[in-house]
């Protein structure tokens, strides 16, 4: 990595990011004469939500009025617009050909009543099941654009609290794995079986669950979005952008603060994911900033359908994010991961530069119904369906990591797999890693390191275990 590039990254790290104020009170976004949304003249083929009865006062439930504007716009492939204000709403469903414009001075605020999010067939956390719709849905539609400089706020703390309350009941019973499925929390934005969809320039706050979920979709662009999920608390499982069994996806210029994976590839869980067998493929992620998350770039843990042809570049990851590059799965997930390229990454005070953990979080990853529980939902059976070991261990190969700089790390590598399915053909080039410890690599074959500078303060080299043909260390 060049000196010039390092200087640019350090300058970006130091520069403050302008963010819309989030006070948690509706009066902070009261309409003003100077707001962009209020002052913009109405253009032809636009549909103003207040013409359909929306109030935008922060207390009235405006779902029906906004949906009426969307339905009208769909008839002419028009644009839905808002006057400045706070619009409280439940689930909205964007339709073919609609542009949905949330301008500066507009906040869409999610209802805190779960009844305002209708149940729909979808996939959640790797299995197909019925689940509450998201706040904004592109559900089996195409040619949709979601744009503007305004705010979409999930108002999700009530759902975070309900999750933690359930965990306090479930963890002592040995059913921690069920909590994420039983506590039905709305995602912020869902693209499901959608095509040719674009979201741009918006600020996304306080998702009740995942923020942007792209599932069974293709030709999707996420551009220049700000995600802030740690306002007023730290929302559990508030992933930033999840790309789930989808193809031809571009994510560019996302600035993310969340309390789980920031940029995440998914492809189904265990027996259900193996049944569906749809990969995530042809994905480009570039020029993103991760300020606080469980990991910067994540593959898994839902790997059953596999990943291929994924290119990640221009990523900056900062403390307190604990891991920069993460591959995670379990011995019941299965799936093939190959054709991954990760480049031009800068990490500042991120404890672990790269981790591969294929036995991740057993209390969540391995579902087993205790004998004393007789009455349970059908998806518990799906989750607990055994997967033969020969199908359950994932295979990782053909991973190329290059041009990475890490400053202030604790460990460079925490990489391991299973002896019966070692990691194969990983290439590392032009790495400059400043870490306390070099770390370890286990169950690896055909790993190559070229032009790698590893400044381990403990003076030890990478600990190689049960590996062969590892060159350049």
Model-assigned labels for residue ranges:
Residues 2-473:
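Extracellular/periplasmic carbohydrate-active domains that bind, remodel
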């Amino acid at each position: 990595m060049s000196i010039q590039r390092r200087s640019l990254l350090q300058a970006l790290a130091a520069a403050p990011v302008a963010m819309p104020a989030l006070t948690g009170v509706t009066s902070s976004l009261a309409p003003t004469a100077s707001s962009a949304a209020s002052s913009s003249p109405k253009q032809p083929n636009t549909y103003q939500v207040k013409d359909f009865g929306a109030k935008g006062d922060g207390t009235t439930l405006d779902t029906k009025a906004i949906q009426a504007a969307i339905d009208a716009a769909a008839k002419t492939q028009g644009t839905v617009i808002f006057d400045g204000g706070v619009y409280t709403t439940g689930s909205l469903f964007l339709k073919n050909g609609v542009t949905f414009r949330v301008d500066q001075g507009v906040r869409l605020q999610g209802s805190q009543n779960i009844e305002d999010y209708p149940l729909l067939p979808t996939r959640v956390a790797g299995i197909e099941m019925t689940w509450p719709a998201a706040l904004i849905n592109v559900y089996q539609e195409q040619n949709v654009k979601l744009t503007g400089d305004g705010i979409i706020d999930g108002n999700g703390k009530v759902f975070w609290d309900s999750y933690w309350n359930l965990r306090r009941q479930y963890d002592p019973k040995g059913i921690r794995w069920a909590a994420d499925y039983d506590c039905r929390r709305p995602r912020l934005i869902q693209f499901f079986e959608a095509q040719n969809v674009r979201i741009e320039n918006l600020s996304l706050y306080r998702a009740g669950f995942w923020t942007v979920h792209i599932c069974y979709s293709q030709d999707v662009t996420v551009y220049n979005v700000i995600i802030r999920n740690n306002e007023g608390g730290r929302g559990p499982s508030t992933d930033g952008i999840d790309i789930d069994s989808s193809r031809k996806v571009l994510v560019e210029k996302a600035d993310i603060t969340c309390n789980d994976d920031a940029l995440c590839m998914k492809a189904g869980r265990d027996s259900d994911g193996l049944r569906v067998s749809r990969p995530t493929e042809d994905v480009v992620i570039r020029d993103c900033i991760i300020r606080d998350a469980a990991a910067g770039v994540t593959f898994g843990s839902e790997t059953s359908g596999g990943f291929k042809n994924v290119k990640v570049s221009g990523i900056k990851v900062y403390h307190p994010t604990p891991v920069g590059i993460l591959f995670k799965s379990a011995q019941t997930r299965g799936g093939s991961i190959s054709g991954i390229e990760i480049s031009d990454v800068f990490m500042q005070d991120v404890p672990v530069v790269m981790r591969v953990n294929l036995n991740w979080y057993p209390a969540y990853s391995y579902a087993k119904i205790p004998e004393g529980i007789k009455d349970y939902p059908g998806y518990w059976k799906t989750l607990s369906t055994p997967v033969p070991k020969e199908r359950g261990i994932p295979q990782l190969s053909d991973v190329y990591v290059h041009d990475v700089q890490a400053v202030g790390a604790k460990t460079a590598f925490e990489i391991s797999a299973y002896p019966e399915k070692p990691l194969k053909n990983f290439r590392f080039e032009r790495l400059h890693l400043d870490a306390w410890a070099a770390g370890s690599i286990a169950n690896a074959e055909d790993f190559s390191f070229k032009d790698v500078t590893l400044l381990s303060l403990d003076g030890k080299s990478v600990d190689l275990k049960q590996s062969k043909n590892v060159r350049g260390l």
